[in-house]
Every structure is written in C-alpha cells, then in structure tokens.
Amino acid sequence: MPVKVFTALVVVDVQNDFLENGALGVPKASEVIDPINRMAQTFERVIVTQDWHCADHVSFAANHEGKAPGDKIQLPYGEQILWPTHCVEGTSGADLATGLRLPMSRVIAILKGNDK
C-alpha cells in the first residue's frame, strides 16, 4: 500500500496558560500567533500539541503540602520539578491560545501530560 505524503505544520503548546498573562506565562509568547495563523493556511495538515493535565497532576506544586513551584521531589521515575497549576483539562487555560485561527478540518490534535 502506498504511503500518503503530506506537508504539516507542528504547533507545540500554544495555549492560554503559556501566554504572557497565563498561569505559566512566557514573555512575548503571543507574538507567535499571527505567524502561525498565516503559515497554517499553506500546509495540508496542522498538528497541534496541548498540555492537558488533570487537576491533581503530580507535577503541580499545589498538590504537595509545603511545596512551591520550582521545588523538586523524588518520584518512582526520578526527580520531578514542581510547576504552578497550568493547562488543567476543561479550563480556558488549557484551550489553544485565543487568537489562533487554524483550519480545523485539517488539524490533528495531540493531548499530552494527561497521565497522573
């Protein structure tokens, strides 16, 4: 069977909680939105990844008494840095960034970080 080859733009974690005023904001993050919108129109597929955590995710400092973002803890798989609560499934912070205008009929979404 022949393999179908297509072009794809990969958009990684462009979510509200990672924009400047989000729970885990990145300076100037919103500056990528317009270029992504323009480029997305020229690709056959757009693959988007989203951080997608349950509220009691093990990496959230709020779920560990006396711990703060940036602290480290030991887990069975090794050292884990603790983060502010962010990209909780079903919240606006986990949504793709406001302003992204993607051709949804050509989008493939990958949710990650959804294990505990």
Range-by-range predicted roles:
Residues 1-115:
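Active-site acidic carboxylates
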